[in-house]
């Protein structure tokens, strides 16, 4: 299928193809060709065949630069696609959701995780296996999920944060992530340890205030942050609340101790950690504090975050829905 602003994408038709009586649904695959060590491109023909068999007339767009997936997703909304599939990491998913979030009528969203960390996919149990991820889209169920909006014009699907440590994910070059995967983050983290410092911040959350020095703050929508799934263990993807985690000022020995607790999910009762849930959060500082938005550079404070409850309809595994229902 070809179209304005579309990359060529061979669509495979069944025997009765375009003459079938039931109209086909329309899907748009938006993929980052550099994610996942460029594996997705090689699997594209079989993905298209699966989508066709499931009743989707499918077109593709390979992103070429930052912000490209936003425009591709906007195109999908304006041309009334039924489904948009994000293929890439958390940054690609963020751009796809950002492209559709402002519209009153939005297509459903599917995800094929091909990034380095894939926090959202981890949170809802979408596997990295391409064929299994496609099966979730065509055989699974969609549920409404929360997203966040920052300063009324930028969106987050998984995490926002500030502090030197949160700069790690967007300081690692894309080529290094392609070659080394998650190891690239560990190496960069070790390199950054000597430069970790606190900043004075004022954080207002649902009528409460934190006004003190902090090493970092994290505003989350899921339980997975940087690949660690125990930082916000009770996070829910559709309860209308962010999790807010503030790591207060501490020395390096204390930092290492709290970090080891966090790996085991035992950090929430530590006096150096403030952990709450809130639907609206405002953060200001007299210092220059950089922001991380779903693993990418998100600007500089001040910032206000608002939870848009159940705003996006996403396909997730049936097992995740059953697990969620049991809680």
Could you say what each language-model-derived stretch is?
Residues 2, 6-84, 208, 321, ...:
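ATP/NTP phosphate-donor binding region
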Residues 161, 165, 218-231, 297:
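Glycine-rich phosphate/pyrophosphate-binding beta-alpha loops
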Residues 33, 87-89, 112-114:
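Glycine-rich beta-strand-to-loop/alpha-helix junction loops that act as flexible
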Residues 54, 63, 102-215:
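Catalytic core of DAGKc-family lipid kinases
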């Amino acid at each position: 299928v070809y179209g304005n602003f579309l990359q060529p994408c061979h669509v495979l038709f069944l025997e009765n193809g375009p003459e079938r009586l039931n109209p086909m649904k329309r899907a748009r695959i938006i993929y980052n060709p550099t994610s996942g060590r460029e594996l997705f491109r090689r699997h594209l023909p079989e993905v298209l065949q699966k989508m066709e068999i499931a009743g989707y007339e499918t077109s593709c767009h390979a992103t070429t630069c930052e912000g490209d997936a936003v425009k591709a997703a906007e195109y999908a909304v304006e041309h009334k696609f039924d489904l948009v599939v994000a293929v890439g990491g958390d940054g690609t998913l963020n751009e796809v959701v950002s492209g559709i979030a402002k519209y009153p009528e939005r297509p459903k969203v599917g995800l094929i995780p091909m990034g380095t960390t894939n926090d959202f996919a981890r949170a809802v149990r979408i596997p990295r296996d391409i064929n299994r991820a496609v099966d979730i889209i065509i055989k699974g169920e969609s549920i409404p999920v929360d997203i966040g909006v920052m300063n009324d014009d930028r969106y987050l699907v998984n995490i926002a944060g500030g502090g030197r440590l949160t700069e790690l994910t967007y300081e690692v070059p894309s080529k290094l992530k392609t070659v080394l995967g998650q190891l690239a983050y560990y190496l960069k983290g070790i390199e950054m340890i000597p430069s970790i410092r606190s900043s004075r911040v004022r954080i207002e959350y649902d009528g409460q205030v934190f006004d003190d020095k902090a090493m970092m703050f994290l505003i989350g929508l899921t339980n997975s942050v940087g690949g660690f799934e125990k930082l916000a263990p009770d996070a829910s993807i559709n309860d209308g609340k962010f999790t807010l985690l503030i790591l207060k000022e501490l020395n390096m020995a204390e930092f290492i101790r709290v970090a080891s607790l966090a790996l085991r999910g035992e950090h929430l009762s530590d006096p150096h950690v403030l952990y709450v849930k809130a639907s609206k959060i405002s953060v200001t500082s007299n210092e220059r504090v950089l922001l991380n938005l779903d693993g990418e550079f998100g600007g500089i404070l001040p910032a206000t975050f608002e939870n848009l409850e159940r705003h996006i309809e996403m396909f997730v595994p049936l097992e995740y829905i059953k697990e969620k229902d049991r809680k």
